[in-house]
Amino acid sequence: TAPKPIDTEANLGVMNAENVNIVVHGHDPSLSEMICEYADSKEMIDYAKSMGAKGITVSGVCCTSNEVAMRRGIPMAGNFLQQENVVLTGACEAIVVDVQCIFPALGPLSKCFHTKFITTSPICQMPDSDFIEFDAGTAGEKAKQIVKLACENFKNRKPELVHIPDLKHKATVGYSVEAIVKTLDGVTNSQVDETGTTKPLLECITSGVI
């Protein structure tokens, strides 16, 4: 689906101490979309509850975070520089990565906690990770496997190591070209102009109104 204006939250405080926390990180939106799809399914939520959690929280890091935020309102745990911090909360059951922007330290760092560091691309396998290859043909099957693995890892969490900062901020995201053009259609005179263009905005700029 195309991005649209939607409310979300950002910073490490979006992680939930009572839920299974899955963090998606990287640049492949097809992976993060499928993770979100299955994490939101009744089957997986019930499975998480059977493991002792109250539900499942998916949050994002880096560019993947922006993709799922502006399409689904998925909260943003942090930017590129905060990827290690989500593990340091002690509440991350799985951090799922794809092709780039991945700190090599995530592997050994995750071993200091209970976090599953899951790599999914053959070109980006890393030490101290669980490799689950993701491709379009088996996307649903592999996403479900990853979500299930995260749920099963909830029982391995060490409560004494959990520290989620009480810090998060509200945000409205999703101002894509499509969303902006749709808004501009509302001020377009369809009797004399075509809809679906940025002409109203351009006219405001060229006339000096903006």
State each model region's role.
Residues 1-210:
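Metallocofactor- and cofactor-centric catalytic cores in central/energy metabolism, strongly enriched
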